Amino acid sequence: GASGLAQVLGYVRKSFGIAPGAEVTTESNPESTSPEFFEGLLEAGYTRVSLGMQSASSRVLQVLERRHTPGRPVDAAKEARAAGFEHVNLDMIYGTPGETDDDVRATLEAVLAAEVDHVSAYSLIVEDGTAMARKVRRGELRVTDEDVLASRYALIDGVLSVAGFDWYEVSNWARPDGECRHNLGYWRDHDWWGAGPGAHSHLGDRRFFNVKHPARYTQHCTAGALPIAEEEHLSPHDRHVEKVMLGLR
């Protein structure tokens, strides 16, 4: 809950400090939030909230195995704004098997009704080993055609652009001054530290990620050892290519 997130941020502030005016974002599932939750986050020092909306269609949410009701993300976003958050994001997923253009339009209408300043829209990726992948393999679900995905993306961009959102990154739209700073940091080749099981870090020419299992991660940390699972050093050429690629987003 908010108290746990407040403790984490307090530890970061005490150990490393937080720059004045820093963007401090947390992500939540809509069904796990409340007005008191958002008030606690704001009091703790969080400045931005991202909510996993996915879709306004109950049928699509069922396929995605999401637990919230179609209207909960909009209510949660309004609660966050009422608590005092200026920056609120809603995440959309498009291309779910069985989704229609009307489903996407309804989701966009709900997004605009929420009066958020940032929207992320991601094409569904069916990951190997998931229940959805097994259903696709058995023929119970059908993967959305790439041409349909392209038309849905154009639909999303068109609706958001007319509503005053600026497309500033391949999957992200924002109102003026609503751009996500940590998103921009990724694409501008900034450095970042990742803390926690499976977290990735980017420091100059070094790329590494932590062990994924929480118990193993804890064992490393309590033993005073870095919990790094794998590490990669990029050559100057690889860094240049990566910077160009990231800049194209």
Locate the predicted segments by residue.
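C-terminal scaffold of the Radical SAM
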Residues: G1-R249
